[in-house]
Amino acid sequence: MGIQAAEISAILKEQIKNFGQAAEVAEVGRVLSVGDGIARVHGLDNVQAGEMVEFPGGIRGMALNLEVDNVGVVIFGDDRSIKEGDTVKRTKSIVDVPAGDALLGRVVDGLGNPIDGKGPIAATERRVADVKAPGIIPRKGVHEPMATGLKSVDAMIPIGRGQRELIIGDRQTGKTAIALDTILNQKSYNEAAGDDESKKLYCIYVAIGQKRSTVAQLVKKLEETGAIAYTLVVAATASDPAPMQFLAPYAATAMAEYFRDNGRHALIIYDDLSKQAVAYRQMSLLLRRPPGREAYPGDVFYLHSRLLERSAKLNKEHGSGSLTALPIIETQGGDVSAFIPTNVISITDGQIFLETELFYQGIRPAVNTGLSVSRVGSSAQTDAMKSVAGPVKLELAQYREMAAFAQFGSDLDAATQQLLNRGARLTELMKQPQYAPLTNAEIVCVIFAGTKGYLDKVPVKDVGRWEQGLLKHLRTNARDLLADITNNDRKVKGELENKIRAALDTYAKDFA
């Protein structure tokens, strides 16, 4: 069969057209077995630990177990479409996520993909999900308050910017409510800050292993209040694979570090880390890593310590930014001595302990002030708050102690009776409805009233009504006083004390 001249020229043209094109080289392996979200892959000899790999159909996975003849890969997605013999490609990049201001107001998954139906995200940069925490030299002591708007927290368990404060308690004790109120409370501060980025606080909420309906409800609340504008929600829900629930906190922290490293302030809420530990346990057991206490792997402490150490307050040379963390841990039957709770308590700078019993007594937020502590203490409070909040914790502690004794004895001396009366009113004063955060100045005035005896003659059942009336009075007739406390931070004594007393006296006369 002869070759025609036209064919020769066509072949030559084709060869010339393809000349100089480099062949695309991809390192590939083959799936040996797949199941339970784990794939064993042979042939990826040069893969790095934590590297992203790609399966057919665009499904991604992360190489975790690097063994002699195969690699254990956890799959970020549905493993039903992956079968034995499929090719797996190296991406040559460690798991990274988008970061930047474009993420604010959005809901994303553990890899930073939008899941809110509002279109793609134009992120300015990408950051590696699991990075090393800042060292000792770039850090600075926590000294700026991070207001939650909750009287019991801001007065007795103050949280500072750059602190890690654990919220711990049984299910249905109001852990998420405290976190959500903290996000909502930042709205007034962010609006007052205007263009001053050093005063604003951006919020990142990470939902780990929660029901989708719960996350949808939370996002709806953020949208209704306008808080979504400065908030990012990262959701790895109960229906997502375990690797996604494991990765989401790291990915969200990388997104939050963008603010910290640019001299701004961010707050990250992990809701909750118990479920991340369970997801990690599932992955580790399926990867055949040896189990330890409560079947958790040996490095479960490192899982949480390397995550929470990334929250820090940076010094001036590094931009003065901060990342504050509020990790949430769910206990079983109030047992704080279980493995994961004790681990996280030892990593964090204090804990807010919520009790079922208090919750059902109607004391909400159900904070057990005896077991709760902030290891940063009053250095994270304003001078005004510091001067009025000091006696509260002591008086409540004495009240709890005396209340236990008073059950046995009937005849009490006047001093003890006075202590019990004051304690009952202070306990009532610490109650606060959800979605009603107070400003720092309002809390100062309310606590001052409680500790200086303004409530001693008010019946316990009327304390809530008295407080609501006082807040209304302050917001309408004493705006100058609230502005003074906010703008000129100083101890409550002398002139300022007289101003507060005058406002309280005026209100006390009118209250009936």
Swiss-Prot record:
SUPFAM superfamilies, A to Z: C-terminal domain of alpha and beta subunits of F1 ATP synthase, N-terminal domain of alpha and beta subunits of F1 ATP synthase, P-loop containing nucleoside triphosphate hydrolases
Catalytic activity as recorded in UniProt: ATP + H2O + 4 H(+)(in) = ADP + phosphate + 5 H(+)(out)
Cell location: Cell inner membrane
GO terms under cellular component: plasma membrane; proton-transporting ATP synthase complex
UniProt enzyme class: translocase
Residues binding ATP, per UniProt: 169-176
Membrane topology: Peripheral membrane protein
EC id: 7.1.2.2
Site location (Required for activity): 372
Keywords: ATP synthesis, ATP-binding, Cell inner membrane, Cell membrane, CF(1), Hydrogen ion transport, Ion transport, Membrane, Nucleotide-binding, Translocase, Transport
Tree of life domain: Bacteria
Cell inner membrane found in the keyword field: yes
Gene Ontology MF: a single term: ADP binding
CDD domains per UniProt: ATP-synt_F1_alpha_C, ATP-synt_F1_alpha_N, F1-ATPase_alpha_CD
The UniProt record lists the keyword Metal-binding: no
Subunit structure: F-type ATPases have 2 components, CF(1) - the catalytic core - and CF(0) - the membrane proton channel. CF(1) has five subunits: alpha(3), beta(3), gamma(1), delta(1), epsilon(1). CF(0) has four main subunits: a(1), b(1), b'(1) and c(9-12).
Family designation: Belongs to the ATPase alpha/beta chains family.
Function statement: Produces ATP from ADP in the presence of a proton gradient across the membrane. The alpha chain is a regulatory subunit.
NCBIfam families: atpA, PRK13343.1
Name of this chain's protein: ATP synthase subunit alpha
Record gene name: atpA
